[in-house]
Amino acid sequence: VISKSCLVPELQSIADNFWHYSEKVYSRPEVKQHCLWLQNQHQRNVNLLLWLSFCQQQHWTVNLELLLIQIRSSEQKLSDFRKHRQAMKPHLSERQYQLLLKHELKLERRQQQLLVLSQQRHPGGQTAELALNTYIEQPEEAAQYLSTLKAALQ
């Protein structure tokens, strides 16, 4: 797990920019809905979807295979925690539930830092748009996702 202090300033700046980008686009209901649909119906990682779209905005190339390998462990932890949080919801006060959500956001941010670190170590040669299409696996879904993001950024 990467803590904030482990990232050199340049990488921390990229991680912070990515986090703010994610907050901005994910706060749009249509983007959130589409991301969650891809997560729930097609087991796609929301952070990776957002990262690939962020990389596309930056005109960066990526190595999708290595990105997937890098986040595999953190994705399992996040998924397990998310299931636990959802199962516990009926048994918790609103304050307790909000604490679990806050912890989940910390896990999400750490996963984003892993993506940034992996990108800097292994930038790859695949355009981010091609990687996004490959990752989503369905051209029409990828096009719709990109269209939704584009509208959210305007």
Model-derived segments and spans:
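Aromatic-anchored, charged helix-turn/loop surface patch used as a conserved interaction hotspot
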Residues: 2-6, 63-119
